[in-house]
Regions:
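Glycine-rich phosphate-binding loops of nucleotide-dependent enzymes
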Residues: 1-123
């Protein structure tokens, strides 16, 4: 099964017995995705998954996420990278531990995100 996921996600390693820490940052992220996707979980939680990942790996992972989402899986992730938001159907903006905005993809703009992130709450 590991070889199948290595090929599907294009993890670059000759030996599947290598420690994950011996892989590049992008391949470590791919290995973590493979582990999550190999489960039967319908909701996958990700914490800033593209931090430190090269552009090519990001595109590979985004394609994989879209493919899995079309099959009914849900991906919920925290990100600090606004370019990742292009891959989201819905975006929630948090401030002080609470949701201050819920934006559909069609209404998503950087201005709305910044305003929601820093605007003072109405009295």
């Amino acid at each position: 099964m590991a070889a199948s996921w290595r090929d599907r996600i294009a993890i670059r390693t000759d030996d599947l017995d290598n420690n994950i820490l011996s892989l590049s940052g992008g391949n470590q992220q791919k290995a973590l995705f493979a582990r999550a996707l190999a489960s039967d979980a319908q909701i996958i939680l990700m914490d800033d998954p593209m931090r430190g990942v090269d552009f090519g790996t990001k595109l590979d992972v985004y394609d994989l996420i879209r493919s899995e989402a079309h099959q009914g899986r849900t991906f919920l992730w925290y990100t600090t990278e606004t370019d990742e938001l292009d891959n989201c159907d819905r975006v929630y903006v948090f401030r002080n531990g609470g949701i201050v905005a819920a934006l559909d993809h069609s209404e998503l703009t950087e201005e709305k995100i910044i305003h929601s992130s820093f605007a003072e709450a109405a009295p």
